[in-house]
């Protein structure tokens, strides 16, 4: 049973987050190990394993990057944990320029405004990549979607770096 089946969801990238959360809570209640406290040792072990499976599946499905990776795995493209280098030199150049721009923000005349504007630009890029991933997965363009997920990971990492800079500027 795949993660989508476990939660009674269609095998697709776009999902209803509130339905996912609701199904998660229902499954947690149904398979909570405490409900099996007086059951046989075997049933207790199965409940613990099922609870772990539910938690793992929820973590995968609630995150758009891991959800896209999981969908790709379901269709024969496993890019999880790969160390493949990005083959798009234009994208890599853009990423280097963005990181340089982020480094320069601390030295700008108004670093907080500069960071806010930069964060908006990167968030827009992130949303554009998500939208493109959804379209590519819907059209079953698995290789293109895999490349797009790789790019999205770069942008997600940049978003994390923005948060670190923000913490340094504020704190």
Swiss-Prot record:
Protein name (record): Co-chaperone protein HscB homolog
Protein keywords: Chaperone
Function: Co-chaperone involved in the maturation of iron-sulfur cluster-containing proteins. Seems to help targeting proteins to be folded toward HscA.
Organism from which the protein derives: Vibrio atlanticus (strain LGP32) (Vibrio splendidus (strain Mel32))
Gene Ontology annotations of biological process type: [2Fe-2S] cluster assembly; protein complex oligomerization; protein folding
Residue ranges of the TM segments: none
Family: Belongs to the HscB family.
GO annotations of cellular component type: iron-sulfur cluster transfer complex
PROSITE patterns listed in its UniProt record: DNAJ_2
Domain of life: Bacteria
GO molecular-function term, one example from the UniProt record: ATPase activator activity
């Amino acid at each position: 049973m795949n993660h989508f089946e476990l939660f009674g969801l269609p095998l697709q990238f776009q999902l209803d987050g509130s339905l996912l959360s609701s199904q998660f809570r229902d499954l947690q209640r149904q398979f909570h190990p405490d409900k099996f406290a007086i059951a046989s040792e075997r049933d207790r072990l199965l409940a613990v394993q099922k609870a772990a499976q539910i938690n793992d599946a929820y973590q995968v499905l609630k995150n758009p990057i891991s959800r896209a990776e999981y969908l790709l795995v379901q269709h024969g493209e496993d890019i999880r944990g790969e160390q493949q280098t990005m083959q798009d030199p234009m994208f890599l150049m853009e990423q280097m320029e963005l990181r340089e721009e982020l480094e320069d923000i601390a030295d700008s005349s108004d670093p907080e405004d500069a960071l806010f504007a930069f964060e908006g630009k990167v968030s827009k890029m992130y949303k554009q990549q998500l939208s493109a991933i959804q379209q590519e997965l819907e059209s079953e363009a698995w290789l293109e979607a895999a490349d797009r997920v790789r790019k999205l990971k770069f942008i997600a990492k940049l978003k994390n770096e923005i948060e670190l800079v923000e913490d340094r500027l504020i704190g």
